[in-house]
């Protein structure tokens, strides 16, 4: 009896693992690896580049609702929208279907992590307005997928160098990548 069970298990296992090579979804592993690598790498980079200049302190909120003429909020919405869009696109490529809600969950999880990092930074703080803008951007993608089954409103970004960064490089950036992120006068 024991030999028959072992033989049956081996025969069954062999049939399971002898499926054609194309039955393994390599795209799934590539997608998950890319998301983990990009997410982890970008969070570590931001921790070392953006937050290293400030002390860590207890979690606190920061009301920036009236700052920067809402350009910061537009940037949060833009980022959330495009993260949701790209994750949904990657999911479609890996699985041949897309559940845009998963893109929203990923985008909100990633951007909330950034807001939490802000919340523990002496130079910043967790902004409920930023959090709401993130939700609005991700929600814009989801709403269009549910209502139109396609994207009708596509948030876009443009940048032209301003003269203000040279006046206040500590606030508006010293080099192109910093200026791109910080100089709202040029966006």
Q: Where do the protein language model's features map onto the residues?
A:
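Bacterial Sec-dependent N-terminal signal peptides
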Residues: 1-23
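Hydrophobic alpha-helical membrane segments
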Residues: 19-187
């Amino acid at each position: 009896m024991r030999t028959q069970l072992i033989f049956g298990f081996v025969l069954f296992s062999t049939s399971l693992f002898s499926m054609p090579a194309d039955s393994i979804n390599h795209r799934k592993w590539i997608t998950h690896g890319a998301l983990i690598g990009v997410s982890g790498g970008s969070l570590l980079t931001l921790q070392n580049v953006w937050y290293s200049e400030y002390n860590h302190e207890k979690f606190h909120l920061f009301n920036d609702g009236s700052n920067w003429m809402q350009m910061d909020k537009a940037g949060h919405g833009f980022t959330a929208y495009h993260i949701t869009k790209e994750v949904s696109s990657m999911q479609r490529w890996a699985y041949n279907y897309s559940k845009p809600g998963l893109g929203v969950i990923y985008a909100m999880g990633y951007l909330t992590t950034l807001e939490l990092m802000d919340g523990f930074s002496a130079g910043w703080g967790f902004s409920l307005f930023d959090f709401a803008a993130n939700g609005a951007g991700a929600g814009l993608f989801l709403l269009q997928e549910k209502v139109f089954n396609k994207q009708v409103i596509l948030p876009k970004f443009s940048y032209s160098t301003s003269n203000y960064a040279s006046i206040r490089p500590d606030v508006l950036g010293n080099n192109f990548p910093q200026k791109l992120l910080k100089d709202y006068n040029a966006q």
